[in-house]
Amino acid sequence: KKLNPYDYVIDGFHKANDTPWKDYKFTEKELVWLSEIARKNTLILDVFARPYALLDLKTTTNFDGVIMSYQNSKVSQELSAQLIFGARSAKGKLPVSLGSRFPIHTQIKTQALGRLTYGTPESVGLSTVKLKKIDSIVTTGLH
């Protein structure tokens, strides 16, 4: 009921990745929740675990998107958020076969919408050195 007022729901499936032997499966409760959310809302599922977790999904019929982010790390989460909101393009391919719904090399390519991304100043034509000088001047002015 709490999600009813929302048009879009982004569900991040996070599992610890400190060891490759850690359990990566969805619980039965999580599968029921996903099914119910997808039935009533626009759902994007972002999996921060091994791709084999997708084998637990009985259906993705009502899912509007599935993103395979692989690692549960700060960098993966930041890049994934940029992808979802259009700052980065999607171009990866699923490296393993996960049955008929997700055969090997499954992919959906998207184009970046030209929004601001996380990155270095040089990636958008700016200079780190000059920005540090500006930062120093502003800091001095504030004190």
List each model region and its residues:
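C-terminal non-catalytic regions of proteins with extracellular/luminal or membrane-system context
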Residues: 1-125, 129
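Beta-lactamase-like hydrolase cores
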Residues: 122-143
